[in-house]
Amino acid sequence: MAARAGFQSVAPSGGAGASGGAGVAAALGPGGTPGPPVRMGPAPGQGLYRSPMPGAAYPRPGMLPGSRMTPQGPSMGPPGYGGNPSVRPGLAQSGMDQSRKRPAPQQIQQVQQQAVQNRNHNAKKKKMADKILPQRIRELVPESQAYMDLLAFERKLDQTIMRKRLDIQEALKRPIKQKRKLRIFISNTFNPAKSDAEDGEGTVASWELRVEGRLLEDAALSKYDATKQKRKFSSFFKSLVIELDKDLYGPDNHLVEWHRTATTQETDGFQVKRPGDVNVRCTVLLMLDYQPPQFKLDPRLARLLGIHTQTRPVIIQALWQYIKTHKLQDPHEREFVLCDKYLQQIFESQRMKFSEIPQRLHALLMPPEPIIINHVISVDPNDQKKTACYDIDVEVDDTLKTQMNSFLLSTASQQEIATLDNKIHETIETINQLKTQREFMLSFARDPQGFINDWLQSQCRDLKTMTDVVGNPEEERRAEFYFQPWAQEAVCRYFYSKVQQRRQELEQALGIRNT
């Protein structure tokens, strides 16, 4: 009958094959269809079949060794008594819960390796909360309160340092300048004419003009900072023009110019040499290289704002302060400014938008005026050692800016802090492990028998979780477990799926299609 129904014959195991075959045959009706449920049990005169506990290397009864069952037949719903059925060994895969299959030892090893990797990954993500001692430890060790106080102080210190770092980063976005005195030295030398009687050749009289300069040392700066801040004289200027007497040197040779370019090499001074044996009046024009660029204001706007030369953002900020102080903002349309009589004269408008201010200011801003120095080049031998000195104000980068940058870029302290944090985390982990061991030993000392029982139950639950096995093997190995109501319906479903599979194979072989 089994061959007629299309089932594969399975070798019986021990004495259970006869009783199992009798129970299966009784469960089928005429034509291979499921018949009325019957009670499964051992054949008369035979004892109950007790299978050993299945393990990783022991297949369940009814399953071919090394084979995996594939879903067969149409999908079936759960038994009538509700819930997902726990189908017994030997049934088709379509009704078998995947979680009931015991994983191979390789799978268990992979799960354990994954757990170790997760622990290592989580260990890298150490947070401030990992430094906190549990309340139980603080109760056991009162001295730990000193550590908690230090931890709270460290938290406040970290917040203060972080706030200061943010303030420094914001400050570095703005130009940090300080005013210094640049002393300019202007001197000249005269070389009189020399005649050579033997060769009949000589040299004409000439003079040489030198323009040099250096920053005056600030008493507040240390010697190291002063050396580090040394700059070339030409780095302070955008251009330098020396205008000589036009009557003496003509319209094509009376100007000596130097302009900064992208490839300019910085120098400590400038030299000009020309022939001549008379005093020469010259004008030195120095154009400072402002960083960021500065502009000279229109005289009317300069009187109104009290600013002569300044950067564009400072000029706009001063104008906004004037508008806010005199309440010139339109009360109904806040994006407009109501010009007073002074602003009307400057901007030639009674009302303008805030967005128009930069454009209107463009026509009122001019390049800054150059520094003009008048000097007389003397050819008198008595004036050769005289040097004219002029002090001008220049803006240089504040030394504090360099210190700010070095503070933000410094990583030595961060590495040391990270090393100490790792030591603290390791110490806290050791303390927590010792706390767990202490509680373990205390529980065992109070009630050894109850503790061992609870511990075994806990280990059993952990083993099931690690091996991903559902069920109770101790109950499943007893025959009484299979006399429950679900067994009859599970057997019927198994054979019904087998019949449907065989029917589909026959229809496919005969070319019959159900319509």
UniProtKB/Swiss-Prot annotation:
Region Interaction with SMARCC1 and SMARCC2, annotated ranges: 168-474
Region: Interaction with ESR1, NR1H4, NR3C1, PGR and SMARCA4, residue numbers: 43-167
Single GO biological process annotation from the record: regulation of nucleotide-excision repair
Primary localization class, coarse: nucleus
Biased composition range(s): Gly residues: 14-23
Expressing tissues: Ubiquitous.
List of residues that carry Phosphothreonine: 203
Cross-link (Glycyl lysine isopeptide (Lys-Gly) (interchain with G-Cter in SUMO2)): 101
SUPFAM superfamilies referenced in this protein's UniProt entry, alphabetically: SWIB/MDM2 domain
Single Gene Ontology MF annotation: chromatin binding
Cell compartments where the protein resides: Nucleus
Keywords, ordered alphabetically: Acetylation, Chromatin regulator, Coiled coil, Isopeptide bond, Methylation, Neurogenesis, Nucleus, Phosphoprotein, Ubl conjugation
GO CC terms: brahma complex; chromatin; GBAF complex; kinetochore; nBAF complex; npBAF complex; nuclear matrix; nucleoplasm
UniProt-annotated stretches for the region Disordered: 1-128
Coiled coil: 412-440
SMART domains for this protein: SWIB
Residues modified to Asymmetric dimethylarginine: 68, 88
SUBUNIT field: Component of the multiprotein chromatin-remodeling complexes SWI/SNF: SWI/SNF-A (BAF), SWI/SNF-B (PBAF) and related complexes. The canonical complex contains a catalytic subunit (either SMARCA4/BRG1/BAF190A or SMARCA2/BRM/BAF190B), and at least SMARCE1, ACTL6A/BAF53, SMARCC1/BAF155, SMARCC2/BAF170, and SMARCB1/SNF5/BAF47. Other subunits specific to each of the complexes may also be present permitting several possible combinations developmentally and tissue specific.
Family label: Belongs to the SMARCD family.
Protein name, UniProt field: SWI/SNF-related matrix-associated actin-dependent regulator of chromatin subfamily D member 1
Source organism: Mus musculus (Mouse)
